[in-house]
Amino acid sequence: MTSFSIDRATYSVGESALVDMVLGKPEFPEQFQGHQVIREGPLDNDALAENGFEGTTAERFRLAGRVTGVMRELGPTSNMAMSDGFDFMAASVVHLFDSPDSVHGWMHDIFLKDFEDRVGESVGQGHQLVSATRLEPQGFFDESVALKVLQGGVDGLISSTVVDFRVGRLLGVAFIGTVGDHERLDQVMQLGQALEKRMVSVVLGSG
């Protein structure tokens, strides 16, 4: 299966197929099976803008070619200790765009650029964006990029390791949030590759 044929196949994917692409809780790594689903379902441009950086608008996302998305996020239960090195959160997200070129543009001009441009700024909830470090993800079918994002607040440091990867006009996102200053690239790549496999199986009609 070539990247061109995958690209072409994603044009027949409708919004309703996205819900079958995000990983279910049993498909997340073993360390997250005791976590709970804290957010899941559709993620339209309005919702994404509300949860994004200050000043971000749904119109900006529409102009970037984003149609909609679906996500599932796991978080800690109340009895979990938020100690240093604890992976408290994990998520898989699938975004639908109008073209593969728009996916590429989003990865570089919105995902990477927005984080890197806002280092040192407040990111809400009393947190400051301390650093955004590019990582080198491997093992994906097409283009992929990754960041380790470090935030600081009154409760200390929180790290997010995020990978974005392209499957035609779809963008897959996997991320893990960790207490303290820690990188989780290997685990995020594992999560992302499971998501990629699921996305491709749905695109090709076997999901």
What are the functions of these language-model segments?
Residues 140-142, 165-171:
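Short, solvent-exposed coil/turn segments at beta-strand boundaries
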Residues 1-81, 207:
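N-terminal "mature-domain start" segment
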Residues 175-207:
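Surface-exposed amphipathic alpha-helical segments
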Residues 23, 30-33, 98-99, 108, ...:
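Sec-exported extracytoplasmic/periplasmic mature domains
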Residues 22, 42, 112-161, 202-207:
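Short Gly/Thr-rich strand-loop-strand
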